[in-house]
């Protein structure tokens, strides 16, 4: 850059700083770049699929899927992991359906959890904004977008038409709180439901509620689905779950993770550690026996998982090795369970 341009730029920057305050415009090379801080989801496979070890702080995340697919379980698991790091968490329960006993079973410290059950969508989003601006809350869950009913709809008659009210409410709220979320370094997770578009002949007829604004403002969008049942003898004790990362602004998208959610217990984390440990050679499997560093730890996956539960230091060591290998690995080096989805899959999402 020649001298005249340098002087002109310096004058412009000085004027901007004088008018808008120091830091209004910065040169990126003047400050050391730092990795985006993340909060674990409670699922090792999903943390790796997200590319940074969890959900990004200072960003908006959307988690959507059909009923009983594990959306609330995943968010409560995220709260439990955040609380282990000393984070303050809030749950905006617009559906009025939060079960404290179930949350406690997943490891959530319900005594320290902030809970709000707002009457209207406007109230829910205003509470969310105020919590963000306090700079004292690290994780906020909004459950769910579909339950954020505008005040005009609540006060109106049952059959009244209110076209686009919820979409306008979400658009206005997200414009307002996005900057505050970044400044507060707060993770805000919106749970959303799926609806069917009428008259779609080709492509995916599924869409999410609340208009398009959340799709744009969200840095990460997760599609969670129940793919099967986990059985013990003839009794169903959980569900097989698949999560696709359909949008990711902080790492490559279209990755997916598969794990089990056990009823009353949550995400089967030790099962993930065993599966990924075997695929990476950190654990050895010979017939039905699993071994770690030459010592047998159990016959069958359930017994091996029990060993890891009784020996958390071994589980932590294996998990750390898995994270160290996979979070720095290219896509070609990842196990099949964490493979990328085709780039053209689910474009409608």
From Swiss-Prot:
CDD domains: RecA. GO terms for biological process: DNA recombination; DNA repair; SOS response. Keywords: ATP-binding, Cytoplasm, DNA damage, DNA recombination, DNA repair, DNA-binding, Nucleotide-binding, SOS response. This is Protein RecA. It holds the Pfam family RecA. It is found in: Cytoplasm. Can catalyze the hydrolysis of ATP in the presence of single-stranded DNA, the ATP-dependent uptake of single-stranded DNA by duplex DNA, and the ATP-dependent hybridization of homologous single-stranded DNAs. It interacts with LexA causing its activation and leading to its autocatalytic cleavage. It comes from Azotobacter vinelandii (strain DJ / ATCC BAA-1303). Belongs to the RecA family. ATP binds at residues 65-72. HAMAP family: RecA. GO terms for cellular component: cytosol. One of its GO terms (molecular function) is damaged DNA binding. PANTHER family: MITOCHONDRIAL DNA REPAIR PROTEIN RECA HOMOLOG-RELATED (PTHR45900:SF1), RECA (PTHR45900). InterPro entries: AAA+_ATPase, DNA_recomb/repair_RecA, DNA_recomb/repair_RecA_CS, P-loop_NTPase, RecA-like_C, RecA-like_N, RecA_ATP-bd, RecA_C_sf. Its main location: cytoplasm.
């Amino acid at each position: 850059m020649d001298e005249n341009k340098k002087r002109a730029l310096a004058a412009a920057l000085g004027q901007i700083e004088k008018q808008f305050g120091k830091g209004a415009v910065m040169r990126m090379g003047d400050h050391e770049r730092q990795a985006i801080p993340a909060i674990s989801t409670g699922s090792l496979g999903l943390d790796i699929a997200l590319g940074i070890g969890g959900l990004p702080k200072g960003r908006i995340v959307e988690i959507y899927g059909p009923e009983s697919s594990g959306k609330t379980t995943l968010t409560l698991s995220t709260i439990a992991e955040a609380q282990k790091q000393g984070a303050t968490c809030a749950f905006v329960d617009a559906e009025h359906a939060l079960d404290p006993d179930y949350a406690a079973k997943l490891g959530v410290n319900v005594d320290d959890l902030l809970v709000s059950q707002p009457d209207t969508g406007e109230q829910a989003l205003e509470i969310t904004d105020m919590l963000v601006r306090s700079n004292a809350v690290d994780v906020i869950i909004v459950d769910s977008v579909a339950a954020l009913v505008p005040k005009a709809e609540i006060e109106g008659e049952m059959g009244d038409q209110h076209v686009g009210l919820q979409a306008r409410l979400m658009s206005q709220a997200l414009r307002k709180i996005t900057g505050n979320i970044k400044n507060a370094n707060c993770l805000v997770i919106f749970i959303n439901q799926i609806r069917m578009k009428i008259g779609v002949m080709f492509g995916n007829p599924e869409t999410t509620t609340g208009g398009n604004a959340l799709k744009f403002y969200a840095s990460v969008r997760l599609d969670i689905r129940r793919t099967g049942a986990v059985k013990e003898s003839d009794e169903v004790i959980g569900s097989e779950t698949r999560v696709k990362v359909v949008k990711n602004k902080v790492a490559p998208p279209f990755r997916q993770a598969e794990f089990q959610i056990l009823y009353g217990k949550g995400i089967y984390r030790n099962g993930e550690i065993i599966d990924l440990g075997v695929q990476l050679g950190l654990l050895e499997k010979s017939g039905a026996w699993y071994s770690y560093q030459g010592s047998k730890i159990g016959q069958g996956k359930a017994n091996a998982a029990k060993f890891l539960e009784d020996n958390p230091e071994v589980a932590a060591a294996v998990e750390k090795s898995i994270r160290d290998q996979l979070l720095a690995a290219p896509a070609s080096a990842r196990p099949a369970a964490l493979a990328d989805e085709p780039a053209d899959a689910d474009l409608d999402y």
